[in-house]
């Protein structure tokens, strides 16, 4: 089951990539580093150019680093787990600018809608 979540976490980031644009970059202005504990690290750059999503470590210091497992990422993406609850129960950790972290919900919503 873990491998399935790893594959699906890649699809979540593919969806996020599909909604990146210069408009989103102008609105958000942040680099996010996702450390998926049982998978890869992902960088969501919503600060530079048209925006980008890649695997690995960020080239610049991220405004926000989020650590969670792939199962909780999928649950959050599908709205089965609320970010505040995940944070309060230790299912995810956030380091950096909390206000920038909160803007991710808009990005996740746009990515969910793009997949419909």
Language model segments and positions:
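Feature captures hydrophobic
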Residues: 1-116
């Amino acid at each position: 089951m873990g491998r399935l979540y790893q594959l699906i976490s890649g699809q979540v980031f593919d969806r996020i990539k599909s909604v990146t644009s210069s408009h989103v970059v102008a609105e958000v202005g942040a680099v996010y580093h996702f450390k998926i504990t049982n998978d890869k690290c992902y960088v969501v750059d919503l600060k530079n150019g048209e925006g980008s999503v890649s695997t690995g470590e960020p080239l610049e210091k991220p405004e926000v680093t989020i650590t969670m497992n792939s199962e909780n990422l999928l649950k959050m993406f599908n709205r089965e787990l609320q970010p505040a609850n995940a944070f309060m129960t230790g299912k995810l950790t956030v380091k950096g600018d909390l206000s920038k972290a909160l803007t991710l919900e808009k990005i996740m919503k746009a990515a969910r809608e793009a997949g419909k």
